Amino acid sequence: MAPEPLSAAGQNLIDTATSVINGIPVSDFYSVASAAISDDGRVFSGVNVYHFNGGPCAELVVLGVAAAAGATKLTHIVAIANEGRGILSPCGRCRQVLADLHPGIKAIVIGKEGPKMVAVEELLPSIYAWDKDYDRI
């Protein structure tokens, strides 16, 4: 599946996450915002919670916010770093969780030509399918 050019909905997600992160005072604890859209058009946002013993990335916070609101399928997601650092590609853990919980979701990432939308499965080659590891279940 080829990457898609940025859509109006994708730009809306970038704008939403940028607004969220720009509205938070500069902090070592909240440095990334994320926004996602559900298949029914609702937009959800959240921020990471950094702590030295670990904490959720912004994308994972958004998954929880969306689930709490009853969203069952997210179609697109983006993460924006603070201090003008812009779009971040999801980390490996987030890629795996996104692929497991929302198969087919597209992440907005930066390409050579600017932002583009890419299926998360393409960002995580040879994806681990935990539900297919029958020897472990």
From Swiss-Prot:
Recorded catalytic activity of this chain's protein: blasticidin S + H2O + H(+) = deaminohydroxyblasticidin S + NH4(+)
Chain positions recorded as substrate binding sites: S31, R85, Y128, W130
Classification via InterPro entries: APOBEC/CMP_deaminase_Zn-bd, CMP_dCMP_dom, Cyt/Deoxycyt_deaminase, Cytidine_deaminase-like
GO biological process, one term: cytidine deamination
GO molecular function, one term: identical protein binding
GO cellular component entries: cytosol
Active site: E59 (proton donor)
UniProt superkingdom: Eukaryota
Cofactor(s) in the UniProt record: Zn(2+)
Keywords assigned by UniProt, alphabetized: Antibiotic resistance, Hydrolase, Metal-binding, Zinc
Domain CMP/dCMP-type deaminase: 1-131
Chain sites annotated for binding Zn(2+): C57, C91, C94
Enzyme class, broadest EC rank: hydrolase
Enzyme Commission (EC) number: 3.5.4.23
Quaternary data: Homotetramer.
Function: Catalyzes the deamination of the cytosine moiety of the antibiotics blasticidin S, cytomycin and acetylblasticidin S.
Family, similarity comment: Belongs to the cytidine and deoxycytidylate deaminase family.
Name recorded for this polypeptide: Blasticidin-S deaminase
